[in-house]
């Protein structure tokens, strides 16, 4: 499995915790963050980190180019447009999508 086959989206502490679980299970992945600050905070993970916002069409292209099979949406709960675009992009590309839900 290559890094692009699993995509974790989010610059939150929850996303980093999920990445550490993937590290412990020896699962290759890419963490996608929107900002350089998010990239700097991701410094302790083993996966590849991509930085920059993606619009719907860019998401579809990235998923196809990287042969992504699973996306984990761990974006901030208020990032509704990101989650909406991810849902549409995964449906278009035929990719499994899981949404991380923060415990209350």
Give names to the regions the model predicted:
Residues 11, 15, 19, 52, ...:
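Small-side-chain structural scaffolding
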Residues 45-64:
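Glycine-rich, highly charged phosphate/nucleotide-binding loops
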Residues 2-6:
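Extreme N-terminal starter segment of soluble prokaryotic enzymes
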């Amino acid at each position: 499995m290559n890094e692009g086959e699993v995509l974790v989206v989010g610059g939150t502490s929850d996303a980093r915790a999920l990445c550490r679980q993937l590290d412990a299970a020896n699962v290759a992945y890419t963490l996608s963050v929107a900002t350089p600050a998010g990239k700097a905070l991701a410094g302790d993970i083993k996966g590849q980190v991509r930085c920059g916002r993606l619009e719907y069409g860019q998401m579809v292209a990235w998923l196809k180019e990287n042969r992504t099979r699973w996306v984990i949406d761990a974006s901030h709960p208020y990032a509704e447009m990101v989650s909406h675009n991810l849902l549409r992009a995964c449906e278009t590309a035929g990719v499994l999508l899981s949404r991380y839900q923060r415990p209350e």
